[in-house]
Structure formats: structure tokens, C-alpha cells
Amino acid sequence: RLAPAVSYKVKFNDVDINKETVKRFQTPADSFTGPVIGSMGMLGIIDDLWARRGEGTAILKYRFYGGNLPNGWERRNIFFSEKDLIGSLLTEFDTLSEIFSLNQFQEIRPLGVELDVEVTRDARVVFIEKLEIANKKDTYEPGGKIELDITLRPWRKRSMVKRIPITVPKNAVGFCEILVRGGGIMEPEQESLAAGLRAISNLDDLLKELSIKETNNQIVAEIDGPKSMEKDGKDKPNIEDLFDERLQSEIRAERIKKGEMVLVDTNYYVEGLLRKVIKI
């Protein structure tokens, strides 16, 4: 009888020389040593196939699957480094491998890991260069729509303008801040977890929070600011207004539904952060 093992598959595509390679290996199914050995194996394979040092862009797609993960879990992200591309792209993979192997809820067995890597020395980077409001006004109405014109400049190429609509919160008062940034830059933290107001209690919740983590290829536009204390016709705030127990997946889903937050996927690594303040 064979000992339990974790299966790894690496699909590596070097765009510059138009060469695709597939490698497979296995590690012992040990929750503590397995991820370390697996990450070292991944690093060795990619380092050998890339066979270069220095700058580059990588598009990664990883998939974790197993007996009690029937649909698996996938994530796609893009990485850019001016000095050490391989080291940069495997940092997130190491973290995810540990989370899946060491999660406190249940063992995923048999566990399989697939990693698709597409690399190039080209700098697939876009910079957020300018943020303007179309048809700018002195004041804005709560619940009103605002058109944002965002100037983006790909590395050493001509700039382009992307228009993104955003909605002022219905209970906004005073001044609101509009923020446009690259995914992962100043990403909101899990405040309810840090404050001890909530805990992740099952694997489904853990996967849900992992799935909403921003990726480096996203443009994030959001608006926030002071809000009226009146809520649902009440003159006084509820305890929920003072202590928000929601997880980030719940908060983000509501903000996206209301139009207060917009995520746009690109094929670039997005750099930059710009702000504007408007009067309500």
C-alpha cells in the first residue's frame, strides 16, 4: 500500500521563447512539512525553467483540490519585479499552501495542487496617472452617480483613459473621499477579526475570505466618508453602527451592490493610488 501523498503539477510557459513545459512531483501528506517541501519543489522547478535572474512579469493561476474540496479553489494573480521575479511570485503561493495544509477545520486529503505560470521579461505594468471627475460639480447628492475618468499609462507606452461609474452613499454627509488604487494597495483589513468581534468558524468561511483578497491586476475605485446617524428611519444609532461584526467578504459584497466600490480586472500589474475629496 502506498503512503498518502500530495500531488503537485507545474505548467510553465515562457512567453519570450514560446516554450511550454509541464512538471509533476509528490510530497508526503504531512500538514506541517508538506507545504515546505512542496514550495521548495515549486521554486526549484520554476527557477530551473526560467533560468534567469532579475526583472519580469508573471501571471499565476493556482488551484487547490481534494476529496472534500469537490469543486476545488482557484486564484489568478499577476506579479512584477524589477529585481527578483521568482521570489516575488512564490511568496503568495507559500502562504496559501500553508493555509490549506494547516487550516484548523479539516484535513484535505488527498490534496492536489496545480500551478500555471506564464512569464515574460516584458514589464506588463500600468500606472494610475490621473484621477478626474467628469462633469465636475461643487456639491453632490447622496445616492447620486459620479463618472470617474482614470488615466492609465502602460510601461513606456501612451496613456489611455478608463471611465468608471461610482455611487455616493445614500446617507453620506459633509465630505466624501474618492480613492482609486491598484489591487492590494491599502486593501481593507479584517477589522472584526482583529478586534475580536468575529471569528472564522468553518472552512467555507475561510475560503470565502481568501477568494475576496484583491489581486495585483485590479483597479479599485471606492468612495467613503461620514454618514448620517439616521438609519432606517431611526434617530439614534444602533450598536451595529458602532461595532461592525461583518467579515470583509460581507462588507465588500454590500459596497459593490450599492455601487460604492468598483473592481476592474486588467491584464497588467497595476501601480498607483490617487484621491479626491468631494462635498455632499
Feature-to-residue mapping (PLM):
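C-terminal recognition in membrane/secretory proteostasis and scaffolding
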Residues: 1-280
